[in-house]
Each structure stands twice: as structure tokens, then as C-alpha cells.
């Protein structure tokens, strides 16, 4: 696990951009993408660059259940706004939040991941150590699945909605086994509220109670964190 500590999220975005550029320069064709406030500075750096993804495929981590793709709170809408409108990919895959048969949608998305092995997957980390929507206690061997979101995750996402009651209670998510199949993982974390999760992920035991700790077992992980998120690490990086 390569750990890079930067001053703030803006600097983290520049480091994240370097990881994307290096992957593209080395022939990466499939990029696993994430949403939320964490990757936006990396996406901004990409948008303002001359990187070309027109021959590449994107596969997103997750999507809320019950939200239409054109809803401004959907992850499809987020990706269009923050990346795809400026940097289109040859093809882009996200779970279908309005799928009438969730079980069939899970199988479809597993097939997408199998047919498009991910070269670089970007991740954030929740305050409880979740990655994607894989909450504490999620089985390590799980692939795409429907998740009942925890109260802490609903609360954390409420800032994006008119009220906490509007936050969806379920989501489709790549599983931990799906994520671990990626060739290279890039995890970003910014802010003091991520410090406990970051410490557990890097220095704590590998435990299902902190899903991100599974990354200790992956052969190629880059972690980009700001000084606040790194504040509880006992070792200097």
C-alpha cells in the first residue's frame, strides 16, 4: 500500500490526476469510477487536462435504488456533471436504479464487470470504513448486491438531498470481491472525519467490521489522504 499525504483536497486532486494519467499512459482501458465529494477535485483536474478517454470504458461503483438516471441526485447525473459531459468515454456502465428486477440487475452488472476487467478503480471511504456501499459486516466474497444503507451512511448523504427523508434507503453496489479484482486501486480520503477510518484501513487489523481494511490484501493500492485524514496514523508517510 503506497500512502501519499498531501496538504489538502486540492493537492489530493492533483495527485489523483497523476495516477489516472499514469494508468492511461500505460495502456489502461477500463476505469472504475466513484461519486461523492471525495473524487471531485481529481475529476476537475482531469476535465482541465488533455487526457482523452474516448477509447476507454468506465464502470461505476454504485447507484441508488429507486432514482431515475436523469434525477439530479442520481450517480449517473453526478458523473455527467463532473466528468462525462467534458470527458466522454467510449461506453459507460452504471447500475440501473430503476431496474424492475433487482436480482437480474445484479447479475447483469456482475457480467459487465467480468467482461470489462477494471484497470484502475478510484474509491472513497466512509466514516465507518465502507467502500462503495459495502457497509461494516459485508461478506468479503460478495459481488454486486443490493444494500440496505446504514443510518450513518444515510445521514452522511443527507447533505445532497432536501432532507434526510429523501435519501434512498437502498443502493446497488459492487461487492468487495468485485473491487478487489481491479488491477490497481486508488483510494482518496480528505478531512478529519475520515481519520479513524483511514487509521483502521492502513494500520488496523484486517476485519469485516472495517470493510476498507480488505485493501491491505491487494497487491497495488495507492492511498491519497490530506493531513487531516492522516492525523491519527501512528507512522509517518
From Swiss-Prot:
GO cellular component: cytoplasm
Superkingdom of the source species: Bacteria
Catalytic activity, reaction form: alpha-D-glucosamine 6-phosphate + H2O = beta-D-fructose 6-phosphate + NH4(+)
GO biological process, one term: glucosamine catabolic process
Record's keyword terms, sorted: Carbohydrate metabolism, Hydrolase
EC number: 3.5.99.6
Active-site residues, as the UniProt record annotates them: 62, 128, 130, 135
Pfam family, one: Glucosamine_iso
Biological or metabolic pathway of the protein: Amino-sugar metabolism; N-acetylneuraminate degradation; D-fructose 6-phosphate from N-acetylneuraminate: step 5/5
Coiled coil: none
InterPro entries per record: Glc/Gal-6P_isomerase (IPR006148), Glucosamine6P_isomerase (IPR004547), Glucosamine6P_isomerase_CS (IPR018321), NagB/RpiA_transferase-like (IPR037171)
Top-tier EC class: hydrolase
A GO MF term: identical protein binding
Entry keyword annotation includes Cell wall biogenesis/degradation: no
Biological role: Catalyzes the reversible isomerization-deamination of glucosamine 6-phosphate (GlcN6P) to form fructose 6-phosphate (Fru6P) and ammonium ion.
Protein family membership: Belongs to the glucosamine/galactosamine-6-phosphate isomerase family. NagB subfamily.
Name recorded for this polypeptide: Glucosamine-6-phosphate deaminase
Biological source species: Lactiplantibacillus plantarum (strain ATCC BAA-793 / NCIMB 8826 / WCFS1)
Lineage: Bacteria, Bacillati, Bacillota, Bacilli, Lactobacillales
